[in-house]
């Protein structure tokens, strides 16, 4: 006979590391070329003028300038777009 109660096993008890997604440069901020503007999954924010898109949908600045967010009408829903305006 067992002298201790057997411990059960569980299939839970693990978690993934956070991916640190989100906006990295907000509207009105000045950025340099190559700066990451937004880390995202999918294109919830579309790239605009002077903004590139990486293979993981990360948006980054192509030139130095000021970050600007804008809302654009696309079909029945509004989409967000981020642009980098050249600094004067």
Curated annotation (Swiss-Prot):
One of its GO terms (cellular component) is cytosolic large ribosomal subunit. GO terms for molecular function: structural constituent of ribosome. Pfam families: Ribosomal_L27 (PF01016). Keywords: Ribonucleoprotein, Ribosomal protein. Residues 1-24 are annotated as: Disordered. GO terms for biological process: translation. NCBIfam families: L27 (TIGR00062). Belongs to the bacterial ribosomal protein bL27 family. This is Large ribosomal subunit protein bL27. The lineage of its organism: Bacteria, Bacillati, Cyanobacteriota, Cyanophyceae, Synechococcales. The gene is rpmA.
